[in-house]
Amino acid sequence: MARYRRTRTRSRSRRRRRSRRRRSSRRRRYGRSRRSYRSVGRRRRRYGRRRRRRRRY
């Protein structure tokens, strides 16, 4: 997080423009499927971690 903050304050306008352009292209390519896949992966990972810890202990 600290690293991201530093770069953001350093070159704000330049980075903002670049990220915006990249984001739009990415959205067109993946679309809605990527968002759902990401959320599902996150949920599954969290659940798996919790289960593992419980079993170990």
Curated annotation (Swiss-Prot):
PROSITE patterns: PROTAMINE_P1. Keywords: Chromosome, Developmental protein, Differentiation, DNA condensation, DNA-binding, Nucleosome core, Nucleus, Phosphoprotein, Spermatogenesis. The keyword DNA-binding applies. It is found in: Nucleus; Chromosome. Its main location: nucleus. Testis. The modification Phosphothreonine is found at residue 9. One of its GO terms (cellular component) is nucleus. GO terms for molecular function: DNA binding. One of its GO terms (biological process) is sperm DNA condensation. Residues 1-57 are annotated as: Disordered. Belongs to the protamine P1 family. Protamines substitute for histones in the chromatin of sperm during the haploid phase of spermatogenesis. They compact sperm DNA into a highly condensed, stable and inactive complex. This is Sperm histone.
